[in-house]
Amino acid sequence: MELSVYNIKGEDTGKKVVLDDSIFAIEPNDHAIYLDVKQYMANQRQGTHKAKERSELSGSTRKLIRQKGSGGARRGDINSPLLSGGARVFGPRPRNYTFKLNKKLKALARRSALSYKAKNNEIIVVEDFNFDAPKTKAFKAISAALKVDEKKVLYVLPEVNKNVYLSARNLPNTNLILANLINTYTVLASKNLVLTERSVAVVNELFKA
């Protein structure tokens, strides 16, 4: 698969870049995507939720009313789950939500997500980002030139670039990621992907089947 390469002014440079078909042109596996996104979301959870059960509450254990004869429901002490302010039955306990997936499935999910983006023409390739100093205004102009300024966009960089990061961090709907850290969730969470030529080379090398 070939895509045109644009400059930061949004102009077609006439150059082409090759996207590896084993990454960007496979038949997407929706179930692999589902499992990988589910794992990503689960791994973000802290799992620190906690509600006190009956044995953990302080307070009197005196029975509030006698067992029979009142005409009302039976009830025990003030911590009874039947009462307002009482304990909770089977409340949440601290737990670890993380789970593992095998590497082949995660790789398939990542390639499936990238193939969806390529199939929907949601991948843009630019020559490079050159910033001598952090300039949010300049980065915003690039987004406008590429016509992605009103959409959620993920910029894929080949390496850490402090000036690019500082220029983009305050822009809404704009995220940055290193090419070697691309994952299924971040790809699908954005409408468009913007890669540099070097980013494409990194992705082609690391993720080819």
UniProtKB/Swiss-Prot annotation:
Belongs to the universal ribosomal protein uL4 family. The keyword rRNA-binding applies. GO terms for biological process: translation. One of the primary rRNA binding proteins, this protein initially binds near the 5'-end of the 23S rRNA. It is important during the early stages of 50S assembly. It makes multiple contacts with different domains of the 23S rRNA in the assembled 50S subunit and ribosome. It comes from Porphyromonas gingivalis (strain ATCC 33277 / DSM 20709 / CIP 103683 / JCM 12257 / NCTC 11834 / 2561). GO terms for molecular function: rRNA binding; structural constituent of ribosome. Keywords: Ribonucleoprotein, Ribosomal protein, RNA-binding, rRNA-binding. The keyword Transferase does not apply. GO terms for cellular component: ribonucleoprotein complex; ribosome. Part of the 50S ribosomal subunit. This is Large ribosomal subunit protein uL4.
